[in-house]
């Protein structure tokens, strides 16, 4: 339209003027020339603005991407207290926390498809399984953070070439939870070494009480018992040499057990089974079974976390925590870091981003941050010299063990979990001698891996950003929300920001990787019919937070919506809902809409308290619904939409 007007003006300029007007011709031409010049400048300016509008929006998003440090958390538990604390300490850094998966295969998939985040956390970890990621991760060996870790523990994270890609946060301590009152009641001395531990088990058996048991239905209990009994030997020079070879990321050959340390480990396991009278019946015991026996005075000791001490003391049972007693006289605590942290090597290409990421890492490893990780009743047992040792009454009986740095970090590769469960279970059931167990374990480690089920169940033709953008929200989260709204068949879907793992990549997904697109820790769905007024209040609770529930702590923690668009105001770290539209029109109070809400069960109860419409059916696991959808054939992802404007 502007260009048509311009042509009309130029056409008018060429008209023949009557003689009576010739005297004013020069003045008119000059005036017209000035008008045309101004108009042409306006047209050019508008055309430039129009042509670059999209580019400007893209530049804004690129700037937001550059300013954002993404941290993937291995569990939703860290999202509620740990993540908000870290953000509060770094108000000038935009940190986006995403609940990923406790599985290194998940991060390998992200790496292979260009989606590896800036900072990774993982609990179920071994250098052996992390080897494929090595070249994509920063070497932290020369950082202050690595230098603060005691060498005893840092050695467990060193690659063959001396580089360090992963650092541990504080330890989850496992050992023996002991009912001291039972020992006093039957006048049985508390164990101080392996011989007195075995004697105590024998004495309790004589009075009809199990001296010791554990939840051997779980792979980690089998694995940690086997290693804990030989922690002293596995940390010798020979033990460390074998562990380094087993974990070497540069080696593609499969590594079995050595013949120096490991045969003795199975001998000690066999002796332990005999001394504690473990039988095939123990293989069916789960955590509730074991703690129930302990609570009822049917078992004097069980293998578990130090958190059990506080739990039972609160119930009035005189409970203490004791370490593993090695047969060579040493005492050790079995530990697993609550998680390990690694940084993406791509950060080294941008000094400003690397500096921000290192600030985030520093806070993540701080004493105050780590205190928000541990379970109630557990002490912060740090592997770092920067965190002072402050043991509470629950851990006072193992102070000497901790001060000696006798905190053994378990070998926790996927192979070790699986093979330990198989072999230790057969030892307990009486099917394997120590020698047979050693040979079976070694053979399984050396066996070629069975090809994984790689049947493709979902294909994404493009990658979508999982960074939150002020004008639109997160594209990958929008894809998931829009797709699930179609699956559930409701008008609207509301989801907490931790619902999705942000892994919408241009890739083929097998069943495992497709399932990993949903947050792994108890995400539930609840369907309701609401009026527009009720929906407004529900969305407000999601955006602004509610009493007793989750409160968004940064822009990345704002909810995801589908079927509506929302406008939110940001001020001093808090968020206010200022508008909702549906189909481009303001949501009416008297409208009737069907709504699906996604959150953990606890969050659903608080977010949907009060006037939240009429519930339709029972809550359901989102991951189950999603897996059924993608495995049903013909699954497709919806397109993303701009669902939020943040001002």
What does each of the following model-derived ranges do?
Residues 244-283:
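Glycine-centered hinge/linker elements that transmit conformational signals in sensory
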Residues 452-647:
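Catalytic centers of hydrolytic enzymes
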Residues 30, 46-127, 190, 436, ...:
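Conserved N-terminal structural module of periplasmic/extracytoplasmic solute-binding proteins
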Residues 165, 198-254:
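Extracytoplasmic/periplasmic solute-binding protein
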Residues 123-174, 189, 224-225, 235-237, ...:
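Hinge/lid segment of periplasmic solute-binding proteins
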């Amino acid at each position: 339209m502007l260009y048509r007007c311009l042509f009309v003006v130029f056409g008018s300029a060429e008209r023949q003027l009557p003689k009576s007007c010739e005297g004013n011709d020069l003045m008119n031409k000059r005036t017209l020339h000035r008008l045309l010049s101004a108009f042409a400048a306006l047209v050019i300016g508008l055309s430039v603005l129009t042509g670059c509008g999209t580019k400007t929006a893209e530049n804004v998003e690129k700037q937001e991407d550059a300013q954002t440090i993404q941290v993937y958390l291995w569990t939703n538990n860290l999202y509620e207290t740990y993540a908000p604390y870290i953000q509060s300490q770094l108000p000038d850094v935009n940190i986006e926390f995403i609940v990923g998966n406790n599985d290194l295969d998940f991060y390998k998939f992200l790496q292979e498809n260009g989606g590896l985040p800036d900072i990774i956390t993982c609990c179920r970890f071994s250098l052996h399984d992390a080897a494929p990621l090595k070249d994509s991760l920063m070497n932290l060996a020369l950082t202050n953070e690595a230098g603060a870790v005691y060498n005893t523990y840092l050695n467990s994270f060193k690659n063959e070439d001396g580089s360090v890609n992963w650092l541990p946060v504080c330890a989850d301590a496992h050992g023996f939870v002991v009912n001291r009152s039972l020992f006093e009641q039957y006048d049985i001395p508390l164990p101080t070494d392996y011989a007195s531990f075995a004697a105590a088990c024998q004495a309790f058996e004589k009075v009809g009480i199990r001296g010791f048991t554990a939840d051997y239905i779980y792979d980690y209990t089998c694995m940690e018992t086997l290693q804990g009994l030989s922690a002293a030997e596995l940390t010798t020079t020979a033990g460390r040499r074998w562990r380094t070879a087993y974990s070497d990321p540069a080696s593609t050959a499969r590594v079995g057990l050595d013949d120096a340390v490991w045969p003795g480990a199975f001998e000690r396991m066999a002796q332990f089974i005999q001394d504690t009278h473990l039988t095939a019946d123990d293989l069916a015991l789960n955590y509730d079974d074991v703690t129930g026996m302990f609570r009822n005075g049917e078992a004097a000791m069980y293998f578990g976390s130090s958190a059990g001490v506080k739990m039972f003391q609160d119930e009035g049972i005189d409970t203490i925590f004791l370490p593993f007693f090695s047969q060579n006289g040493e005492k050790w605590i079995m530990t697993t870091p609550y998680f390990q942290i690694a940084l993406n090597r791509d950060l080294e290409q941008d000094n400003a981003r690397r500096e921000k990421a290192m600030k985030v890492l520093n806070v993540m490893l701080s004493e105050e941050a780590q205190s928000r990780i541990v379970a109630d009743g557990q002490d912060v047992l740090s592997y770092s010299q920067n965190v002072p040792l402050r043991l509470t009454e629950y851990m006072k009986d193992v102070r000497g063990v901790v001060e000696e740095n006798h905190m053994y970090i378990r070998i926790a590769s996927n192979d070790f979990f699986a093979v330990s469960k198989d072999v230790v279970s057969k030892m307990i059931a009486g099917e394997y001698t120590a020698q047979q167990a050693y040979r079976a374990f070694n053979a399984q480690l050396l066996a070629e891996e069975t090809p994984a089920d790689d049947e493709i169940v979902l294909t994404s033709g493009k990658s979508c950003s999982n960074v939150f953008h002020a004008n639109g929200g997160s594209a990958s989260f929008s894809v998931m929300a829009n797709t699930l709204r179609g699956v559930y068949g409701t008008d609207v879907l509301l989801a907490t920001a931790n619902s999705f793992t942000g892994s919408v990549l241009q890739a083929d997904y097998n069943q495992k990787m497709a399932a990993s697109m949903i947050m792994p820790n108890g995400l539930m769905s609840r369907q309701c019919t609401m009026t527009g007024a009720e929906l407004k209040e529900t969305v407000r609770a999601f955006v602004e937070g509610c009493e007793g529930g989750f409160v968004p702590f940064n822009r990345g923690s704002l909810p995801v919506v589908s079927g509506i668009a929302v406008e939110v105001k940001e001020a001093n770290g808090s968020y206010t809902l200022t508008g909702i539209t549906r189909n481009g029109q303001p949501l009416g109070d008297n409208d009737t809409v069907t709504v699906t809400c996604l959150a953990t069960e606890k969050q659903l109860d608080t977010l949907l308290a009060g006037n939240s419409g009429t519930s339709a059916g029972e809550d359901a696991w989102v991951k189950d619904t999603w897996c059924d959808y993608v495995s049903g054939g013909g699954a497709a992802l919806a397109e993303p939409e701009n669902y939020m404007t943040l001002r």
